[in-house]
């Protein structure tokens, strides 16, 4: 994976009701820098993974997947997620949350770069 200025780290577990809105809120971000998305799913038993795979098919270069092969729990899933990116900064979002501002990443990045 090429080093990017920022990686969005997105953690999920059985978030089928929310994951689409969350992913849309991430992918609507407008920035003047490159960023990627790392998704760590903790062996969801609902349709969360299928929905994530639909987005991966649409954005294969932007989205990287960590699909646990068994339920490892939130702590290990989080550790696997935040140690995966090779970026200067990380922005974090949970699978049952979403962003409302399309410039959220740009604003965060600008503040961190000051």
Language-model segment annotations:
Residues 1-114:
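Nucleotide-sugar donor-binding/catalytic module of glycosyltransferases
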């Amino acid at each position: 994976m090429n080093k990017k200025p920022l990686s969005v780290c997105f953690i999920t577990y059985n978030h089928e009701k929310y994951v689409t809105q969350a992913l849309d809120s991430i992918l609507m971000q407008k920035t003047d820098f490159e960023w990627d998305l790392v998704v760590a799913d903790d062996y969801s038993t609902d349709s969360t993974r299928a929905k994530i795979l639909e987005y991966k098919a649409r954005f294969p270069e932007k989205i990287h997947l960590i699909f646990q092969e068994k339920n490892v729990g939130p702590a290990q899933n989080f550790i696997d997620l935040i140690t995966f990116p090779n970026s200067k900064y990380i922005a974090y979002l949970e699978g049952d949350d979403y962003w409302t501002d399309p410039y959220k990443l740009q604003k965060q990045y600008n503040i961190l770069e000051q």
